[in-house]
Amino acid sequence: MKNNVIAISRQYGSGGRELANILAEKLGYKLYDRQIVHMAAAQLGISGMSESQLKEFEDNVPPLSLKFMPFYIFGMSGAKPMNHKMFEQESEIIRRLAKDGNCIILGRCADAVLQGNENVCSVFVCANDEYREERGRTVYDGKSVIELNQEDAKRAEYYAYYTGKEWGNPKNYDLSVNTSHKSLEDIADVIIDYINKK
């Protein structure tokens, strides 16, 4: 029997992480988030980096125009830049985790990495600005919608660079859910119902 995998992408402040935790608890699935980054860093020999250093490293996505330039992709020495190696390592880990058992993968372009696998349900989680503003104030240390949107812009840039697709475009996901007007528990039940009928 094939393992079921839920790949969740989410707007900052939409409650996507909390939704992933609820789904993991209801389904008994393992949840993977930042662990994937640390696993990849360990395999690349950069496990000594702090969480903030790894985050800064990830946010440093080169301009899309450089992506197909041979001198950038392989460098003057012929070696790939570390951020390319990091993404490739994370992708390899994601594919392995998807084979190991039922799981939920939060972010990391998992929907694109696992594209074509029939047992994968890709979900995009969004919310209106009022909801995100409230969560920014209460959950994310008083972050404003502007700050949340800046984080989303980084996610969109990262996603576009490594997948060639538009982050958040509903056509790229099996489900898009808006957390603004329903409880996360109810939305989790909708996702579970969809998976059971898929």
Per-segment meaning from a language model:
Residues 41-102:
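ATP-dependent small-molecule kinase phosphotransfer cores
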Residues 97, 110-116, 137:
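RNA pseudouridine synthases
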Residues 61-67, 142-185:
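Small-molecule kinase domains that catalyze NTP-dependent phosphoryl transfer to phosphate-bearing small molecules
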Residues 91, 184-192:
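Short, amphipathic alpha-helical "lid/cap" segments that border enzyme active or binding sites
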Residues 2-5:
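Extreme N-terminal starter segment of soluble prokaryotic enzymes
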Residues 116-150:
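Conserved phosphate-donor/acceptor-positioning beta-strand/loop module used by diverse small-molecule
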